[in-house]
Amino acid sequence: MTYLTRILETKAEEVAELKKQDPERRYHEACGDLPATRDFRSAITSLDGGINLIAEVKKASPSRGVLVEDFRPLDIAERYAEIGASAFSVLTDRQYFQGSPDYLKAITQKFSIPVLRKEFIIDESQIYETRLMGADAALLIVAALEPSQLRDYLQLFAELGLHALVETHDERELDTALEQGSTIVGVNNRDLKTFTVDLMTSVRLRQRMPDGIVSVAESGMKHRDDIQMMQEAGFDAVLIGEGLLVSEELRQFSWG
């Protein structure tokens, strides 16, 4: 069983429980009274040839285990804001990444920087939940969804004022993302089936993206040269979690 398959099975169980606790109708009604979201798309769009940082607040991963023993999400976010992060990515998955919706809520309340919910979304109820948490954007993984689901979820995101970072890993997934109307497209250098990393995945797929797409390279970048490679490939932003924890080079990079 692959990492992704295992995670999605767990998500199906979580969604079933979520629907018992708070039906979608109540979620929908509650979302109508919320303030406007912050503009995630504009925050990460490169206007002058620079590259923006989506800094991930991350405690653990399935492949590496716990990355930060004394995990203080607000302190981590503060450091990332100081080095020039354009947006935050916050893990809310509990079982595999030891994340929490509470981390996301705390960060959205303290900072004016847009916040992306990093989660494995497989059901509309999670999208309403995302809006109620205070997130400005969320991840949609092409490998976890049918094309028709992706199209419908993108429409719901727009209705709720959310932006979607649509994650791809190969040419087929990129084509699906574009065909279904994605405007912010990420390329994950990490294969979610095996968790192996190849930075050339981003470089290769970026060449296939048309003008007007906001592009994000994700995972595996740990050195200044890695960021420069993504910048030269034409990416608007990079999403980095573990690399910021281990690399002084990345913390001192000139972001934006």
Swiss-Prot record:
It holds the Pfam family IGPS. InterPro entries: Aldolase_TIM, Indole-3-glycerol_P_synth, Indole-3-glycerol_P_synth_dom, Indole-3-GlycerolPSynthase_CS, RibuloseP-bd_barrel. One of its GO terms (biological process) is L-tryptophan biosynthetic process. Its EC number is 4.1.1.48. GO terms for molecular function: indole-3-glycerol-phosphate synthase activity; phosphoribosylanthranilate isomerase activity. CDD domains: IGPS. It comes from the Bacteria. Pathway: Amino-acid biosynthesis; L-tryptophan biosynthesis; L-tryptophan from chorismate: step 4/5. This is Indole-3-glycerol phosphate synthase.
